[in-house]
Amino acid sequence: MMLLGLAIGEQAKGQEYPWSLQYITNMQVLNPAFVGMWDKSGLMVSTRTNWVGINGAPLSQYAGYFTPVKDQHSGVGLSIQRLNTGLEKRLSLSGDYSFQVRLDMYNYLRFGLRAGILNYDNNLSNYQLYPDHIPDPEFNPDVRFYNMTTFGAGAVFFNEDYFISISVPQVINNSFKVNRNNFSASIYNPKTAYLSGSYIFSLVNGVHLRPNLLVVGTIGKPIYLDLATIAYLPINLQVGINLRTTGSVCFSAQYTFKNKMRIGYASDYAVISDIRKYQVGTYEFVIGYELDNGRRKYN
């Protein structure tokens, strides 16, 4: 039964909502209120490999489409996300809706809702006991193709210079029972809240600097911080660095082509965590495309 805690307990009960290393320029992944905030429609795909060097480490892939409607007072989006950890597989399909309220001449408040379906699959009979490498009879039958509802919400206050965002991407505790021992597991439990704030400073020669603070709070776990800064250069290049209180540092870069396609890369390295000696980092690639010219600052 030792592997049960590893295969399901830690991943199913202790895992936060999957989010991008380059979340600052892809805030719609964390907060549905950002969907449709831009001037035109957009597409984004990404892939992230966690903890390279560890067999069965998380692999996540994401694809999304977002567009404003009704003169940008509201927006809609559709996304699909896959997360594989060991033999555990999660596939989610979500729809987002956001609407905007103008507070005064300069300030806006935007709200967002997210709803979807999560498919969960875990081939327990293929897990093997160490060191004998034989199947555990307690893992029979498998957890196969459970479909569950997902729901999230968020809000963002913003103007041309800064934003303050808060969201809970998944607020529903989905549970199910497996095998003859009535083992139960929960998906995305406990809930995780994300509070983020960012300000854009205009420097010389067309350079802009954007510091960002992300506070991540999960019930039953310590609060941790992500401190980041992105520099926007006039050559359509942006570079960034993130420092996390969990003991890791992230470097990122993103380039926007003249046809409005953007390509981003990020690498995350553990610097004080015990896991550092077993892996060589986490890596993420992002490709985005705008269907027309024009884009607001926050994406």
Regions from the PLM with identified roles:
Residues 1-7:
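Bacterial N-terminal signal peptides
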Residues 15-299:
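Subset of outer-membrane beta-barrel
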Residues 8-16:
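Sec/Tat signal peptide C-region and signal peptidase I cleavage site
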